[in-house]
Amino acid sequence: METNLLLVKCVLLASCLIHPRACSPSCNFPAIFNFGDSNSDTGGLSASFGQAPYPNGQTFFHSPSGRFSDGRLIIDFIAEELGLPYLNAFLDSIGSNFSHGANFATAGSTVRPPNATIAQSGVSPISLDVQLVQFSDFITRSQLIRNRGGVFKKLLPKKEYFSQALYTFDIGQNDLTAGLKLNMTSDQIKAYIPDVHDQLSNVIRKVYSKGGRRFWIHNTAPLGCLPYVLDRFPVPASQIDNHGCAIPRNEIARYYNSELKRRVIELRKELSEAAFTYVDIYSIKLTLITQAKKLGFRYPLVACCGHGGKYNFNKLIKCGAKVMIKGKEIVLAKSCNDVSFRVSWDGIHFTETTNSWIFQQINDGAFSDPPLPVKSACTR
């Protein structure tokens, strides 16, 4: 009997080592608080500067949803997996429900503050430090208003949710492309990356000081494989790899990611009560782009929604752009007809199909450190 019990334990242990997801505890996160840029913006920039036009949102929401994609983003799939509603943008005052979290991300956001990057990124003034201010204000005001009772109690999070929530970070890509816009060399961009990580680390420390304990951090994508980077910041043919990606741009991203992982390791030691999950988005997206055909995708370096050129990307005519010709409105940048098979949505962001595939890889735990699914991200 004892021998059989020991055998069962050994089999279970081996199974857990091979498939850690199957043996991981569920954390029952009651809320998500997200910080980021357009990769996870669910309506922040649209609420501030006007809605991202149709065909953004065409696939899932069937109308513009504040997202720069035809449908759902990775953060939406994370919410679904945790059994939570999609996150409303903190800046969106129309019909928002913050009972299970809030999204502080806005498209174009950078880690570094405006005095360092606003002239470079040229899009959003809502950098990560501003998102932190918004979050801090949200903690205080949400509880003051929730205590009024009635409908306010239903629309705002419970106080304890702030210490039990999952805190997600997906930001940094715009800090790197900001350097490209200033014609900086790879070495010049790499030189300011430590400052980017200093400021990101400081924000995480401040969230920790306000009760945050579960952190889910994405690294940055292979920049050299994004259609808009290939179009706007071309490199000589000798610096293009076999898959059509710009080698020096990907080298910048890899350096950023290696340093980010080192910072996460340091934060684990420093903030001993916190659980950190570092997610290797770079490797997942690179796998998808370099093995697109094998995985059932088409034209990984060509935007689905765009206007002309090798990469179907035009910085002056972006997805959904229209013109008036003889009193008639004409859409110049339309969606492709095979969006469910495409990788890139608009040359910058990804399609819903791509985001879904990426999330499946994330949730397997194989690309995360520690190798856990999102439901178990409270594990230290």
Swiss-Prot record:
The active site is at residues 38, 346, 349. Residues 1-25 form the signal peptide. Its main location: secreted. It comes from the Eukaryota. Glycans are attached at residues 97, 115, 183. One of its GO terms (biological process) is lipid catabolic process. Pfam families: Lipase_GDSL. It catalyses: hexadecanoate ester + H2O = an aliphatic alcohol + hexadecanoate + H(+); a butanoate ester + H2O = an aliphatic alcohol + butanoate + H(+). Its EC number is 3.1.1.-. GO terms for cellular component: extracellular region. GO terms for molecular function: lipase activity. It is found in: Secreted. Lipase activity is inhibited by phenylmethylsulfonyl fluoride (PMSF), but not neostigmine bromide (NB). The keyword Iron-sulfur does not apply. Keywords: Glycoprotein, Hydrolase, Lipid degradation, Lipid metabolism, Secreted, Signal. Belongs to the 'GDSL' lipolytic enzyme family. Lipase that can hydrolyze p-nitrophenyl butyrate and p-nitrophenyl palmitate in vitro. Possesses low activity against p-nitrophenyl acetate. Substrate preference is p-nitrophenyl palmitate > p-nitrophenyl butyrate >> p-nitrophenyl acetate. Lacks cholinesterase activity. This is GDSL esterase/lipase At3g26430.
